[in-house]
């Protein structure tokens, strides 16, 4: 703010400068803090990088003597125990460990043709996961003292023999670094080995392994093309003798900083380990268990897998031992089992002895797996990738994370459905998929609700196998170990989107900060699977593009690129095979992109299935049953004002029902997205999402042609609600208007459904301004010439009242609800008609004829004041504890309060006189009794005064509320008064709040726009919003709670200085009724008096909906008027009062001048059925409008 030199600053200017300075200081502090954080992060990153390089050098130096050491290669000692320790969260101290108890067996590589070759590639120093030494442990490598101290923090105890510290895993290009330390207390035991690099496989230890392991991109390890394909699980199950020569699947282990990634490497078919005691061990995917601190140990001969469950129960370590598959389950030993689990395993093992083969056991475990997982999915499923399993026996598509082909799970689904009821699928997904990795956070929440179905089916089978549950009721034991948690998978841009062979496991509390919900499914009445069985292996993807490449010998390697695709936008959805996904409790917290209507045809098109379909002879009835269950289960519409949850009749799919109009407004604001209509509603046709998405502009049809039951594009799987009717109508899809009969028919039809008494809710207990109007007929009325004014059309037009409600009709509700619904439906019809005609704005006038309307004079008030009458209003005034409807009349020098004695007699209660400044208008303040405000001035408002009566002596009082150059003033609900004053440089927008009795007030200032405000308008349906029209034909909107200026929206320049009379909010749109005092008369369109426009506040795009013009033969322009609910009244320059029904879009009544005197002002009373019209001589006429 530039001031001339030497001019002192005022206090206000000093305060403003102080505020600006404080703001700048805050911003500077924030910026400085960000910069400091960035610098610290860079330093830490550099330090870590340097430390890693130093450790690599030390590791290389420590490993070089080992490789040069001569040692016999004909005997290798496999250590007694191989312990893998995983440090999860430093804050919670959670730990999980896996211990492999492999007996101190020695296998002679001489059994193979060429002994045990040690494979090296480039600079790879060694492929052994542990050092080669004699059993006595004579070879000991001394480590620097600094390294020893560092390693001590990663060991569990010195009693454990071999520790793999995954916290210290380091991936270092093509090199494999390894460090060892031998326990001084147990020199006879095997040396302790700590792996600090990317673990390569055990392939180098296997005989007959001529091909080296190739490492690609540090993330995925591929078998050379000459390798034999790995045999699938079915092959393992059907081999009679496999304990002598079993394939050892290879593993690689890495650490990404937030989770473990286990990457499976198929071995060569010729690589066999000839040992009698070492069973087939196969690590597949991490699994999530919860056992309240318990331990579960399964031992097969000398194979021990000890799962140390953490406090929270999350165990993101390798599970799913195929030893349970590849050997008879009755060979289980219980030597090392905890006491609390030994008994359960023994009992379960007895039930399993009745099974004929391990394959039967596996079938029993995985029976209801796929069905239960699909049932438990609260969100859409996201495809990750596929892996080549059973390539030798079948050519199948295996989704990423599945241990077996989808055919296997479908086949085993039926036999297990009787025993497996409650499935903790979400708990399994929690540990597998992680919730939010570093870098994702909440960046792309719109897709974070898509669950990546990576290893769910595998996890279920793993849990059943490890707990030896076989289709008996004893499966509850293992089920109790599972916790149901809400899962969201990262879907945003990632540093490494190659998720082809990764199973992401995350410890709880590391980076997951979201809420956890429990979604147990009742055991007695399950819903049918929500997806057809034939498409169980196919899941929807939303943000990923899958590209596949086939290698030799049917080796398939799939990479999931992190590219965004819009399948749900581009592919049309069919309703015949749609399946509804149950919603979680927090499904409405944020706008998320979900696809809840999955089409079988659409899903099949997402994947290229290679020669695999479920055989109809085995699965035909099952497929038909599932498809039928999906198609015959429509979603019930929501009931009005019902909160909580409601179950579907057929099952237990739970849908939250609490929806607020505010949330609906938020979700429906962005109308540029596609609108997808749920089936089962009254829509004959849904919008074409593909064609709408390709449009670049925003036409009136897109902006307003919102179907009656629609959902936002980011909430596709949620059914819309038939909520309690909001303040402004929901746009329907009724046909375009035809002749006048169509209007009447549509109006009658809507009215017949609701048939409401035309009055507002907060005034429904009020009494009429006059007593029963039936007692006044034309013969007994002193005002006979204009007692009944049948304007035009049929005089016997029936009105909708409570007596005409047919049986079974709900009780009357607020009239503005159904009438404004009519208005919006008619608006939508008008838009649809204009859309067909390809017009951008609705500039067509209303119908030429006048719809029948009835104005009946019910009372007349004669004001004896000699000055000119300027305004009139109706309000309640409390006297002797009783609130009575009264009329306030304003002349230039006096304001009077009138009470009705009977229909034609009025008593003056109070009078306030003004000698200095004349009265311009009355400003009623809703919800305030015994107080009325008036605006004083000559041509512009100079003062605002509050008029009331003293409670002591009943004398009239007046208080100055505001003075100055006041541009606009309006009374708002909740006892508020808003005013705008000052010039552009010092403009103030102030809101005053009164007490209920009128005493005391609070002031609040709103952020002023840079334009002069002409009028204010309250937004019906959103009490905390305020509109204002400016001199530049802009509409501004404020938040009354915060005082913030939210948006400035420009409207059409066709009419200058438009005045906003009323605004309605619905579905994120603003419907605004404008008047055009400066509009020129046009013979083609006649004189536009009112106009209905709609604005999208988010995009600031506006479009004209309807023009309300005079009927033929009438002339004049708008002078002043009033809008109440669905009725608008205006005084024309010709002296006539015209009334429009905003629902019908027509002029419904004309009131010519009475006694050759023009009408001066017109106001609607507290109910929309009474009209107050005044003349300059002080006469006030009360009409009943119907």
UniProtKB/Swiss-Prot annotation:
Intracellular or extracellular location(s): Nucleus
GO molecular function: DNA binding
Location of region: Interaction with RAD51, BRCA2 and POLH: 853-1186
Sequence segments annotated as region (DNA-binding (with the preference D loop > dsDNA > ssDNA)): 1-579
UniProt biased composition (Basic and acidic residues): 120-141
Keyword Lipid metabolism: no
Protein name: Partner and localizer of BRCA2
Purpose of the protein: Plays a critical role in homologous recombination repair (HRR) through its ability to recruit BRCA2 and RAD51 to DNA breaks. Strongly stimulates the DNA strand-invasion activity of RAD51, stabilizes the nucleoprotein filament against a disruptive BRC3-BRC4 polypeptide and helps RAD51 to overcome the suppressive effect of replication protein A (RPA). Functionally cooperates with RAD51AP1 in promoting of D-loop formation by RAD51. Serves as the molecular scaffold in the formation of the BRCA1-PALB2-BRCA2 complex which is essential for homologous recombination.
Top-level lineage group: Eukaryota
Pfam families: PALB2_WD40
Disease tied to this entry: Breast cancer: A common malignancy originating from breast epithelial tissue. Breast neoplasms can be distinguished by their histologic pattern. Invasive ductal carcinoma is by far the most common type. Breast cancer is etiologically and genetically heterogeneous. Important genetic factors have been indicated by familial occurrence and bilateral involvement. Mutations at more than one locus can be involved in different families or even in the same case. Fanconi anemia complementation group N: A disorder affecting all bone marrow elements and resulting in anemia, leukopenia and thrombopenia. It is associated with cardiac, renal and limb malformations, dermal pigmentary changes, and a predisposition to the development of malignancies. At the cellular level it is associated with hypersensitivity to DNA-damaging agents, chromosomal instability (increased chromosome breakage) and defective DNA repair.
GO terms of biological process kind: animal organ morphogenesis; apoptotic process; double-strand break repair via homologous recombination; embryonic organ development; inner cell mass cell proliferation; mesoderm development; multicellular organism growth; negative regulation of apoptotic process
GO cellular component: DNA repair complex; nuclear speck; nucleoplasm; nucleus; protein-containing complex
Subunit composition and interactions: Homooligomer; dissociated upon DNA damage thus allowing association with BRCA1. Oligomerization is essential for its focal accumulation at DNA breaks. Part of a BRCA complex containing BRCA1, BRCA2 and PALB2. Interacts with BRCA1 and this interaction is essential for its function in HRR. Interacts with RAD51AP1 and MORF4L1/MRG15. Component of the homologous recombination repair (HR) complex composed of ERCC5/XPG, BRCA2, PALB2, DSS1 and RAD51. Within the complex, interacts with ERCC5/XPG and BRCA2.
Species assigned in the record: Homo sapiens (Human)
Keywords: Coiled coil, Disease variant, DNA damage, DNA recombination, DNA repair, DNA-binding, Fanconi anemia, Nucleus, Phosphoprotein, Repeat, Tumor suppressor, WD repeat
Modified residues (Phosphoserine): 172, 190, 285, 376, 387, 454, 660, 781
Consequence when changing residue 14 to A: Loss of interaction with BRCA1 but no effect on interaction with BRCA2
WD repeats, residue ranges: 854-915, 917-961, 962-1009, 1010-1052, 1058-1109, 1115-1153, 1155-1186
Coiled coil ranges: 9-41
Record-linked InterPro entries: PALB2 (IPR042417), PALB2_WD40 (IPR031920), WD40/YVTN_repeat-like_dom_sf (IPR015943), WD40_repeat_dom_sf (IPR036322)
Biased composition (Basic residues): 143-152
């Amino acid at each position: 703010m530039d001031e001339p030199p030497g001019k002192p600053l005022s206090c206000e200017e000093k305060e403003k400068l102080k505020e600006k300075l404080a703001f700048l200081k805050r911003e500077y502090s924030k910026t400085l803090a960000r910069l400091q954080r960035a610098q610290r992060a860079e330093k830490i990153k550099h330090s870590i990088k340097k430390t890693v390089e130093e450790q690599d050098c030390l590791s290389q130096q420590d490993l070089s003597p080992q490789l040069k050491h001569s040692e016999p290669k004909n005997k290798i000692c496999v250590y007694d125990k191989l312990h893998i320790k995983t440090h999860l969260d430093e804050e919670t101290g959670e730990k999980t460990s896996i211990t492999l108890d492999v007996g101190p067996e020695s296998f002679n590589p001489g059994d193979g043709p060429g002994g045990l070759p040690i494979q090296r590639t480039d600079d790879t120093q060694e492929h052994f996961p542990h050092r080669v030494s004699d059993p006595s442990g004579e070879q000991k490598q001394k480590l620097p003292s600094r390294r020893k101290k560092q390693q001590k923090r990663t060991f569990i105890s010195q009693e454990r023999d071999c520790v793999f510290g995954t916290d210290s895993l380091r991936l270092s290009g093509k090199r494999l670094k390894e460090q060892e330390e031998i326990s001084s207390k147990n020199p006879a035991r095997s040396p302790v080995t700590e792996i600090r690099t990317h673990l390569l496989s055990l392939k180098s230890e296997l005989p007959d392994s001529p091909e080296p392991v190739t490492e690609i991109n540090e993330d995925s390890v591929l078998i050379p093309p000459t390798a034999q394909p790995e045999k699938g699980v079915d092959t393992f199950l059907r081999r009679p003798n496999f304990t002598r020569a079993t394939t050892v699947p290879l593993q690689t282990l890495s650490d990404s900083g937030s989770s473990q990634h286990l990457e499976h490497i198929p071995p060569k078919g010729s690589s066999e380990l000839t040992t009698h005691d070492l069973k087939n061990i196969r690590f597949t995917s991490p699994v999530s268990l919860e056992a309240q601190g318990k331990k579960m140990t399964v031992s097969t001969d000398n194979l021990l897998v000890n799962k140390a469950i953490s406090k929270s129960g999350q165990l993101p370590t390798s599970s799913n031992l195929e030893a349970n598959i590849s050997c008879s389950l009755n060979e289980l030993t219980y030597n090392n089992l905890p006491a609390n689990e030994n008994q359960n395993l023994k009992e379960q093992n007895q039930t399993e002895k009745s099974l004929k083969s391990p394959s039967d056991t596996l079938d029993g475990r995985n029976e209801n797996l796929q069905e239960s997982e699909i049932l438990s999915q609260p969100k859409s499923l996201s495809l990750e990738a596929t892996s080549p399993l059973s390539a030798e026996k079948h050519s199948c598509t295996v989704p990423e994370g599945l241990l077996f082909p989808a055919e296997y799970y479908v086949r085993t689904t039926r036999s297990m459905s009787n025993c497996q009821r409650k499935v903790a699928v979400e708990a399994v997904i929690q540990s597998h998929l992680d919730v939010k990795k570093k870098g994702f956070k909440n960046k792309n929440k719109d897709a974070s609700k898509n669950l990546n179905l990576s290893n769910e089916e595998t996890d279920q089978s793993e849990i059943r196998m490890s707990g030896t549950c076989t289709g008996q009721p004893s499966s509850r034991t293992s089920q109790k170990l599972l916790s149901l948690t809400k899962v969201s998978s990262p879907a945003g841009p990632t540093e490494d989107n190659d998720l082809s062979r990764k199973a992401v496991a995350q410890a709880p509390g590391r980076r997951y900060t979201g809420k956890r919900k429990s979604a147990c499914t009742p055991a007695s009445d399950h819903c049918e699977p929500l997806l057809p069985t034939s498409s169980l292996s196919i899941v929807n993807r939303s943000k990923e593009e899958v590209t596949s490449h086939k290698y030799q010998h049917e080796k398939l390697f799939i990479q999931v690129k992190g590219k965004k695709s819009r399948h749900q936008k581009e592919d049309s959805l069919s309703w015949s095979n749609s399946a509804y996904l149950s919603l979680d409790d927090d499904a409405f917290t944020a706008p998320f992109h979900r696809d809840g209507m999955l089409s079988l045809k659409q899903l099949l098109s997402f994947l290229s299935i290679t020669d695999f379909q479920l055989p109809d002879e085995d699965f035909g009835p099952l497929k038909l049953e599932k498809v039928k269950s999906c198609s015959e289960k429509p979603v019930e519409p929501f009931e009005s004002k019902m909160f909580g949850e409601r179950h579907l009749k057929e099952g237990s799919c739970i849908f939250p029902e609490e929806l607020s109009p505010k949330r609906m407004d938020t979700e429906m604001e962005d109308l540029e997205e596609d609108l997808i209509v749920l089936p089962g509603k009254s829509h004959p046709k849904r919008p074409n999402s593909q064609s709408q998405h390709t449009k670049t502009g925003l036409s009136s049809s897109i902006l307003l042609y919102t179907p009656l039951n629609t959902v936002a594009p980011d909430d596709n799987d949620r059914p819309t609600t038939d909520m309690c009717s909001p303040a402004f109508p929901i746009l329907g899809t009724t046909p375009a208007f035809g002749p006048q009969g169509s209007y009447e028919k549509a109006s009658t039809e809507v009215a017949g459904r609701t048939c409401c008494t035309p009055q507002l809710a907060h005034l429904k207990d009020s009494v009429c301004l006059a007593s029963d109007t039936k007692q006044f007929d034309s013969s007994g009325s002193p005002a006979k010439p204009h007692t009944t004014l049948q304007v035009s059309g049929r005089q016997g037009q029936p009105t909708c009242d409570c007596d005409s409600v047919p049986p079974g009709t709900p009780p009357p509700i607020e009239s503005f609800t159904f009438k404004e619904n009519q208005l919006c439906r008619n608006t939508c019809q008008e838009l649809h008609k204009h859309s067909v005609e390809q017009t951008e704005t609705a500039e067509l006038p209303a119908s030429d004829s006048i719809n029948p309307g009835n104005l009946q004079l019910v009372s007349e008030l004669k004001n004896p004041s000699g000055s000119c009458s300027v305004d009139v209003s109706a309000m309640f005034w409390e006297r002797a504890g009783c609130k009575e409807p009264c009329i306030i009349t304003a002349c230039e020098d006096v304001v009077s309060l009138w009470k009705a004695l009977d229909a034609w007699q009025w008593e003056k209660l109070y009078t306030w006189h003004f000698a200095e400044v004349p009265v311009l208008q009355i400003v009623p303040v809703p919800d305030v009794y015994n107080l009325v405000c008036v605006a004083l001035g000559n041509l512009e408002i100079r003062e605002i005064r509050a008029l009331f009566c003293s409670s002591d002596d009943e004398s009239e009082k007046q208080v100055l509320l505001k003075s100055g150059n006041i541009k606009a003033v309006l009374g708002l609900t909740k006892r508020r008064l808003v005013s705008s004053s000052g010039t552009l440089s010092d403009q103030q927008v102030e809101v005053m709040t009164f007490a209920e009795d009128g005493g005391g007030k609070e002031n609040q200032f709103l952020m002023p726009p840079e334009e002069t405000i002409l009028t204010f308008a309250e937004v019906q349906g959103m009490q905390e919003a305020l509109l204002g029209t400016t001199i530049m034909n802009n509409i501004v909107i404020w938040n009354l709670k915060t005082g913030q200026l939210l948006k400035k929206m420009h409207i059409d320049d066709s009419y200058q200085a438009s005045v906003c009379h009323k605004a309605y909010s619905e579905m994120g749109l603003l419907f605004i009724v404008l008047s055009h005092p400066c509009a020129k008369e046009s013979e083609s369109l006649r004189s536009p008096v009112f106009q209905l426009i709609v604005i999208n506040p988010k995009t600031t795009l506006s479009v004209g909906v309807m023009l309300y013009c005079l009927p033929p033969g009438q002339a004049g322009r708008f002078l002043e008027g009033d809008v109440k609910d669905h009725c608008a009244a205006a005084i024309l320059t010709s002296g006539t009062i015209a009334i429009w029904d905003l629902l019908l879009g027509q002029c419904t009544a004309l009131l010519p001048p009475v006694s050759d005197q023009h009408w001066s002002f017109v106001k609607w009373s507290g109910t929309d059925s009474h009209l107050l019209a005044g003349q300059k001589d002080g006469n006030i006429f009360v009409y009943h409008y119907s």
